[in-house]
């Protein structure tokens, strides 16, 4: 999973990236501190594999991972090449989902490119640039197929779709709210355009420390972000990038104490992971043994052979059966052999849909 972190200059984007990845990316109080996208691989916090590791006395515990890309700050006019616009738009096309950091804190020491704090304006600035970029892509497609569409029914059908999506964008709406016809061709065409505004989006409302305890409930800027996200089907989570940066330097025990003192249940990374898995429809299954306990990320609805293929393509090709036990059942039993004796280990075939928290042993030829 690859997430692109975007936002206007000086909203806390690189500070958040630094704290999530501990990568120490250059973070400065001026536009375009991030010129090339910084990339960081982050472990997905999951206590299940830690506990499985203890149960199996395993040599190695391997969590699932998320790749974060810190993409250069964006300004008005990026779709026409202003600032670092073209580079920004090329980088963002490669990600699975967008994490849009929005400034919801007041601080006279940190300049805002537009001189004031206004999340609605900031969101619209970036969204409009993404829309303009998508319209340009659709215009290029229209120019390519319009002439041939007069004599080709399939291209005529695609042209109708492209023009409908373009009209939707010209109304200021994101492509992800466009209702694609329930038709296989239309679905394939729409996906093939790889539109920026079709990508799932998570808004990170970056607040001051005082707004964390009530999850931004008393912050009018956060309320506006939530309202706009609801209209476009996006997720929102509240974060204080400055606090996340401090947490990144602490041990797990110190982190817990610090969060308790703040009156906060989970870190920003935990919130972001939960939002990412939710908006992308992802789950994790687990494999366990003395050599390694590991979490694997798959789409909800994935069947056993395809899940096996995440481990190795040979597992999918030669799939025979999957031995499956629920993580909590295995933990309660204290040993795989006990879970088997109690009839909690099931033998599943190729049509089995893998569930979150399944501990699986694949049998393959």
Language-model segments: residues:
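Glycine-rich, flexible loop/turn motifs
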Residues: 23-31, 38-40, 48-51, 80, ...
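Conserved G1/Walker A P-loop phosphate-binding module
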Residues: 1-111, 139-140, 144-145
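Amphipathic alpha-helical transducer elements in NTP-driven molecular machines
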Residues: 32, 46-49, 62-68, 82-96, ...
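Conserved Switch II/interswitch segment of TRAFAC-class P-loop GTPases
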Residues: 40-45, 72-82, 93-155, 168-182, ...
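Flexible interhelical turns and helix-capping residues at alpha-helix boundaries
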Residues: 9, 131-134, 194
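C-terminal-of-GTPase-core extension/linker across diverse P-loop GTPases
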Residues: 2-6, 17, 146-353, 360, ...
């Amino acid at each position: 999973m690859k997430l692109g972190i975007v936002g206007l200059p000086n909203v806390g984007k690189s500070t958040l990236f630094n704290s999530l990845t501990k990568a120490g990316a250059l973070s400065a109080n001026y536009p375009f501190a991030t010129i090339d996208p910084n990339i960081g691989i982050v472990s997905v916090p999951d206590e299940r594999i830690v506990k499985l590791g203890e149960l199996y006395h395993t040599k190695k515990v391997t969590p699932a991972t998320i790749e974060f890309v810190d993409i250069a700050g964006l300004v008005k006019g990026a779709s026409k090449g202003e600032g670092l616009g073209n580079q920004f738009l090329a980088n963002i096309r490669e990600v699975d989902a967008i994490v849009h950091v929005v400034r919801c804190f007041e601080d006279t020491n940190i300049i805002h490119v537009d001189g004031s704090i206004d999340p609605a304006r900031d969101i619209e600035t970036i969204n409009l640039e993404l829309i303009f970029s998508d319209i340009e892509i659709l215009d290029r497609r229209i120019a390519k197929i319009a002439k041939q569409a007069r004599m080709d029914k399939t291209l005529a059908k695609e042209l109708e779709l492209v023009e409908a999506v373009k009209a939707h964008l010209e109304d200021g709406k994101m492509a992800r709210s466009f209702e694609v016809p329930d038709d296989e061709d239309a679905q394939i065409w729409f996906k093939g355009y790889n539109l920026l505004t079709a990508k799932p989006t998570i808004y990170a409302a970056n607040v001051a420390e005082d707004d964390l305890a009530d999850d931004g409930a008393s912050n009018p800027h956060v309320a506006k972000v939530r309202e706009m996200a609801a209209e476009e089907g996006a997720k929102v989570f509240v974060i204080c990038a400055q606090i996340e940066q401090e947490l990144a330097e602490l041990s797990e025990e110190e982190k817990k104490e610090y969060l308790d003192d703040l009156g906060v249940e989970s870190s920003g990374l935990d919130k972001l992971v939960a939002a990412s898995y939710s908006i992308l429809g992802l789950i994790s299954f687990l494999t366990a043994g003395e050599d390694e306990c590991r979490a694997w990320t798959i789409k909800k609805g994935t069947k056993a052979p395809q899940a096996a293929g995440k481990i190795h393509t040979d597992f999918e090709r030669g799939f025979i059966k999957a031995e499956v036990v629920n993580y909590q059942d295995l933990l309660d039993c204290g040993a795989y052999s006990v879970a088997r004796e109690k009839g909690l280990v099931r033998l599943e075939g190729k049509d089995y849909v893998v569930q979150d928290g399944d501990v699986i042993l694949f049998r393959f030829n």
